[in-house]
Curated annotation (Swiss-Prot):
Homodimer. NADP(+) binds at residues 87, 136-140, 160-165, 225, 248. SUPFAM superfamilies: Aminoacid dehydrogenase-like, N-terminal domain (SSF53223), NAD(P)-binding Rossmann-fold domains (SSF51735). GO terms for molecular function: NADP binding; shikimate 3-dehydrogenase (NADP+) activity. This is Shikimate dehydrogenase (NADP(+)).
Length: 286
Protein backbone atom coordinates (compact mmCIF):
# COMPACT_ATOMS: atom_id res chain seq x y z
CA UNK A 1 0.00 0.00 0.00
CA UNK A 2 2.94 2.37 0.49
CA UNK A 3 4.23 4.95 -2.01
CA UNK A 4 6.52 7.96 -2.10
CA UNK A 5 3.93 10.72 -2.34
CA UNK A 6 4.62 14.25 -1.15
CA UNK A 7 3.61 14.38 2.52
CA UNK A 8 3.10 18.12 3.00
CA UNK A 9 -0.41 18.91 4.17
CA UNK A 10 -1.88 15.42 3.90
CA UNK A 11 -4.75 14.82 6.31
CA UNK A 12 -6.14 11.53 7.63
CA UNK A 13 -8.85 10.60 10.13
CA UNK A 14 -10.36 8.02 12.41
CA UNK A 15 -14.14 7.86 12.42
CA UNK A 16 -16.60 5.97 14.57
CA UNK A 17 -19.62 6.56 16.76
CA UNK A 18 -18.59 7.35 19.40
CA UNK A 19 -14.92 8.04 18.67
CA UNK A 20 -13.83 10.22 21.61
CA UNK A 21 -12.19 7.21 23.28
CA UNK A 22 -9.95 6.45 20.28
CA UNK A 23 -6.20 6.51 20.89
CA UNK A 24 -5.46 6.54 17.16
CA UNK A 25 -4.81 10.33 17.10
CA UNK A 26 -2.17 9.84 19.81
CA UNK A 27 -0.51 7.04 17.84
CA UNK A 28 -0.47 8.79 14.48
CA UNK A 29 0.35 12.15 16.03
CA UNK A 30 3.44 10.58 17.61
CA UNK A 31 4.56 9.19 14.25
CA UNK A 32 3.95 12.48 12.45
CA UNK A 33 6.14 14.27 15.01
CA UNK A 34 8.95 11.71 15.12
CA UNK A 35 9.09 11.48 11.31
CA UNK A 36 8.85 15.28 11.02
CA UNK A 37 5.88 15.18 8.66
CA UNK A 38 3.52 18.09 8.09
CA UNK A 39 0.29 16.10 7.86
CA UNK A 40 -2.52 15.71 10.38
CA UNK A 41 -4.64 12.92 11.82
CA UNK A 42 -7.79 13.59 13.79
CA UNK A 43 -10.90 11.96 15.17
CA UNK A 44 -14.17 12.69 13.36
CA UNK A 45 -17.36 11.47 15.00
CA UNK A 46 -19.92 10.42 12.38
CA UNK A 47 -23.33 8.91 13.07
CA UNK A 48 -24.43 5.83 11.10
CA UNK A 49 -26.99 7.96 9.24
CA UNK A 50 -24.31 10.45 8.19
CA UNK A 51 -21.64 7.91 7.27
CA UNK A 52 -22.56 7.51 3.55
CA UNK A 53 -22.31 11.29 3.11
CA UNK A 54 -18.96 11.28 4.91
CA UNK A 55 -17.66 8.64 2.48
CA UNK A 56 -19.06 10.55 -0.50
CA UNK A 57 -17.13 13.64 0.61
CA UNK A 58 -14.01 11.52 0.98
CA UNK A 59 -14.41 10.14 -2.54
CA UNK A 60 -14.91 13.52 -4.20
CA UNK A 61 -12.06 14.98 -2.10
CA UNK A 62 -14.24 17.75 -0.68
CA UNK A 63 -13.49 16.48 2.84
CA UNK A 64 -9.79 17.26 2.48
CA UNK A 65 -8.77 13.78 3.65
CA UNK A 66 -6.57 11.31 1.74
CA UNK A 67 -7.91 8.41 3.80
CA UNK A 68 -8.35 7.19 7.32
CA UNK A 69 -9.34 4.56 9.82
CA UNK A 70 -12.84 3.28 10.48
CA UNK A 71 -13.96 1.84 13.80
CA UNK A 72 -17.20 0.64 15.37
CA UNK A 73 -19.94 0.74 14.09
CA UNK A 74 -18.85 1.66 10.56
CA UNK A 75 -16.49 -1.15 9.47
CA UNK A 76 -19.08 -3.19 7.56
CA UNK A 77 -20.62 -0.25 5.70
CA UNK A 78 -17.13 1.12 4.91
CA UNK A 79 -16.38 -2.16 3.17
CA UNK A 80 -19.62 -1.95 1.19
CA UNK A 81 -19.05 1.66 0.12
CA UNK A 82 -15.43 1.20 -0.97
CA UNK A 83 -14.68 1.00 -4.70
CA UNK A 84 -11.77 -1.42 -4.29
CA UNK A 85 -11.88 -3.54 -1.12
CA UNK A 86 -9.01 -6.03 -1.00
CA UNK A 87 -9.24 -9.79 -0.39
CA UNK A 88 -8.84 -9.44 3.38
CA UNK A 89 -11.81 -7.08 3.53
CA UNK A 90 -13.83 -9.23 1.15
CA UNK A 91 -13.53 -12.29 3.36
CA UNK A 92 -14.14 -10.39 6.59
CA UNK A 93 -16.95 -8.23 5.23
CA UNK A 94 -15.41 -5.29 7.06
CA UNK A 95 -12.72 -2.65 6.50
CA UNK A 96 -10.83 -0.49 8.97
CA UNK A 97 -8.46 1.38 6.63
CA UNK A 98 -9.40 3.52 3.63
CA UNK A 99 -7.34 5.46 1.09
CA UNK A 100 -7.81 7.25 -2.22
CA UNK A 101 -5.79 6.03 -5.18
CA UNK A 102 -6.30 6.83 -8.86
CA UNK A 103 -9.65 8.40 -8.06
CA UNK A 104 -11.00 5.30 -6.33
CA UNK A 105 -11.60 4.51 -2.66
CA UNK A 106 -9.56 1.47 -1.62
CA UNK A 107 -10.12 -0.51 1.58
CA UNK A 108 -8.34 -3.11 3.64
CA UNK A 109 -8.49 -4.55 7.14
CA UNK A 110 -5.27 -4.35 9.16
CA UNK A 111 -6.53 -5.93 12.41
CA UNK A 112 -5.12 -9.36 11.54
CA UNK A 113 -1.75 -7.92 10.55
CA UNK A 114 -1.67 -6.02 13.83
CA UNK A 115 -2.41 -9.21 15.73
CA UNK A 116 0.34 -11.27 14.09
CA UNK A 117 2.90 -8.43 14.16
CA UNK A 118 2.36 -8.11 17.92
CA UNK A 119 3.01 -11.83 18.42
CA UNK A 120 5.99 -11.76 16.03
CA UNK A 121 7.56 -8.96 18.06
CA UNK A 122 6.80 -10.30 21.54
CA UNK A 123 7.03 -14.06 21.00
CA UNK A 124 8.76 -15.02 17.72
CA UNK A 125 7.98 -18.57 16.64
CA UNK A 126 4.42 -18.54 18.00
CA UNK A 127 3.18 -19.80 14.63
CA UNK A 128 5.09 -23.09 14.78
CA UNK A 129 2.07 -24.69 16.42
CA UNK A 130 -0.48 -26.75 14.51
CA UNK A 131 -3.34 -25.98 16.90
CA UNK A 132 -4.87 -22.73 18.18
CA UNK A 133 -7.85 -21.98 20.41
CA UNK A 134 -9.84 -18.77 19.92
CA UNK A 135 -12.19 -17.81 22.75
CA UNK A 136 -15.12 -15.82 21.39
CA UNK A 137 -16.96 -15.60 18.07
CA UNK A 138 -17.80 -11.89 17.87
CA UNK A 139 -16.67 -9.42 15.23
CA UNK A 140 -13.22 -9.08 16.80
CA UNK A 141 -12.49 -12.77 16.36
CA UNK A 142 -12.82 -12.74 12.57
CA UNK A 143 -9.57 -10.96 11.76
CA UNK A 144 -7.72 -13.08 14.33
CA UNK A 145 -9.01 -16.34 12.82
CA UNK A 146 -8.15 -15.13 9.33
CA UNK A 147 -4.63 -14.10 10.33
CA UNK A 148 -3.86 -17.29 12.28
CA UNK A 149 -5.14 -19.42 9.40
CA UNK A 150 -3.11 -17.46 6.86
CA UNK A 151 0.05 -18.00 8.93
CA UNK A 152 -0.35 -21.74 8.44
CA UNK A 153 -1.92 -22.98 11.67
CA UNK A 154 -3.73 -26.17 10.63
CA UNK A 155 -6.38 -26.46 13.36
CA UNK A 156 -8.24 -23.46 14.74
CA UNK A 157 -10.82 -24.17 17.42
CA UNK A 158 -13.36 -21.42 18.10
CA UNK A 159 -15.08 -21.72 21.48
CA UNK A 160 -18.13 -19.59 22.23
CA UNK A 161 -21.10 -19.46 24.60
CA UNK A 162 -23.39 -19.64 21.57
CA UNK A 163 -21.96 -22.41 19.42
CA UNK A 164 -24.04 -21.28 16.43
CA UNK A 165 -21.96 -18.08 16.27
CA UNK A 166 -18.79 -20.15 16.26
CA UNK A 167 -20.22 -22.37 13.52
CA UNK A 168 -20.86 -19.31 11.36
CA UNK A 169 -17.13 -18.54 11.55
CA UNK A 170 -16.26 -22.13 10.69
CA UNK A 171 -18.49 -21.87 7.63
CA UNK A 172 -16.88 -18.55 6.66
CA UNK A 173 -13.21 -19.44 7.11
CA UNK A 174 -13.02 -23.04 5.99
CA UNK A 175 -12.57 -26.64 7.07
CA UNK A 176 -9.63 -26.04 9.40
CA UNK A 177 -11.82 -23.86 11.66
CA UNK A 178 -13.90 -25.86 14.15
CA UNK A 179 -16.79 -24.66 16.35
CA UNK A 180 -17.27 -25.69 19.99
CA UNK A 181 -19.45 -24.74 22.99
CA UNK A 182 -17.84 -23.41 26.17
CA UNK A 183 -18.20 -26.82 27.83
CA UNK A 184 -15.61 -28.20 25.40
CA UNK A 185 -12.93 -25.61 26.23
CA UNK A 186 -10.72 -27.88 28.33
CA UNK A 187 -10.82 -30.64 25.74
CA UNK A 188 -9.98 -28.48 22.72
CA UNK A 189 -7.12 -26.79 24.58
CA UNK A 190 -5.16 -30.05 24.64
CA UNK A 191 -1.73 -29.57 23.04
CA UNK A 192 -2.71 -26.19 21.55
CA UNK A 193 0.24 -23.83 21.16
CA UNK A 194 -1.79 -20.63 20.99
CA UNK A 195 -4.73 -19.40 23.07
CA UNK A 196 -6.42 -16.13 22.12
CA UNK A 197 -9.13 -14.31 24.06
CA UNK A 198 -11.24 -12.12 21.76
CA UNK A 199 -14.08 -11.57 24.24
CA UNK A 200 -14.67 -8.77 26.75
CA UNK A 201 -14.09 -11.21 29.62
CA UNK A 202 -11.62 -9.59 31.96
CA UNK A 203 -12.05 -6.04 30.72
CA UNK A 204 -12.53 -3.41 33.39
CA UNK A 205 -15.79 -4.06 35.28
CA UNK A 206 -16.05 -7.53 33.70
CA UNK A 207 -15.74 -10.65 35.84
CA UNK A 208 -13.34 -13.14 34.28
CA UNK A 209 -13.86 -16.89 34.62
CA UNK A 210 -11.12 -19.05 36.09
CA UNK A 211 -9.44 -21.04 33.33
CA UNK A 212 -7.15 -24.02 33.77
CA UNK A 213 -4.53 -23.56 31.05
CA UNK A 214 -2.67 -26.79 31.88
CA UNK A 215 -4.03 -28.74 28.86
CA UNK A 216 -2.12 -26.35 26.55
CA UNK A 217 1.25 -27.32 25.10
CA UNK A 218 4.11 -26.61 27.49
CA UNK A 219 5.49 -23.80 25.29
CA UNK A 220 2.08 -22.32 24.44
CA UNK A 221 1.45 -18.59 24.18
CA UNK A 222 -1.65 -16.99 25.72
CA UNK A 223 -2.70 -13.62 24.33
CA UNK A 224 -5.63 -11.24 24.75
CA UNK A 225 -6.78 -8.64 22.25
CA UNK A 226 -8.16 -6.62 25.17
CA UNK A 227 -5.63 -4.02 26.37
CA UNK A 228 -7.57 -2.24 29.14
CA UNK A 229 -6.44 -3.37 31.62
CA UNK A 230 -3.05 -4.18 30.13
CA UNK A 231 -2.73 -7.38 32.11
CA UNK A 232 -6.21 -8.89 31.99
CA UNK A 233 -7.26 -11.48 34.57
CA UNK A 234 -6.94 -14.18 31.89
CA UNK A 235 -3.34 -13.18 31.17
CA UNK A 236 -2.59 -13.03 34.89
CA UNK A 237 -3.99 -16.54 35.34
CA UNK A 238 -1.94 -17.89 32.43
CA UNK A 239 1.20 -16.22 33.75
CA UNK A 240 0.66 -17.66 37.22
CA UNK A 241 0.31 -21.09 35.61
CA UNK A 242 3.69 -20.71 33.90
CA UNK A 243 2.69 -19.77 30.36
CA UNK A 244 4.13 -17.06 28.14
CA UNK A 245 1.69 -14.18 27.65
CA UNK A 246 1.33 -11.28 25.22
CA UNK A 247 -0.94 -8.32 25.97
CA UNK A 248 -3.21 -6.68 23.40
CA UNK A 249 -1.68 -3.21 23.23
CA UNK A 250 0.79 -4.17 20.52
CA UNK A 251 -2.06 -5.23 18.24
CA UNK A 252 -3.53 -1.72 18.48
CA UNK A 253 -0.17 -0.14 17.66
CA UNK A 254 0.84 -2.48 14.84
CA UNK A 255 -2.55 -2.39 13.08
CA UNK A 256 -2.11 1.37 12.73
CA UNK A 257 1.20 1.20 10.86
CA UNK A 258 0.05 0.08 7.36
CA UNK A 259 -2.47 2.90 7.08
CA UNK A 260 0.05 5.52 8.17
CA UNK A 261 2.50 4.36 5.53
CA UNK A 262 -0.21 4.47 2.87
CA UNK A 263 -1.38 8.01 3.66
CA UNK A 264 1.92 9.66 4.53
CA UNK A 265 4.45 7.63 2.51
CA UNK A 266 6.71 6.74 5.44
CA UNK A 267 6.93 3.46 7.35
CA UNK A 268 6.45 4.17 11.08
CA UNK A 269 8.09 2.25 13.92
CA UNK A 270 6.27 0.78 16.89
CA UNK A 271 8.71 1.51 19.72
CA UNK A 272 8.79 1.59 23.51
CA UNK A 273 8.28 5.36 23.60
CA UNK A 274 4.97 5.03 21.74
CA UNK A 275 3.91 2.15 23.96
CA UNK A 276 4.72 4.20 27.07
CA UNK A 277 2.76 7.16 25.67
CA UNK A 278 -0.38 5.06 25.24
CA UNK A 279 0.00 3.39 28.65
CA UNK A 280 0.30 6.83 30.26
CA UNK A 281 -2.91 7.90 28.53
CA UNK A 282 -4.64 4.73 29.72
CA UNK A 283 -3.53 5.43 33.29
CA UNK A 284 -4.76 9.02 33.02
CA UNK A 285 -8.25 7.92 31.99
CA UNK A 286 -8.78 5.16 34.53
Amino acid sequence: MGDSRETHGLNAFVTGYPVKHSRSPLIHGYWLRTLNLAGSYRAVEVTPDDFPAFIAALKDRSSGFVGGNVTIPHKEIAFKLADRPDELSEELGASNTLWLEDGLLHATNTDGRGFTANLDECHPGWDRTDRAVILGAGGASRAVIQAVRDRGVNEIHVVNRTVERAQELSDRFGAQVHAHPMAALGEVMRSAGLFVNTTSLGMENEVAPTIDFSPLAENAVVTDIVYVPLKTPLLAQAEEQGFATVDGLGMLLHQAAPGFETWFGKRPVVDEVLRALIIADMDKHR
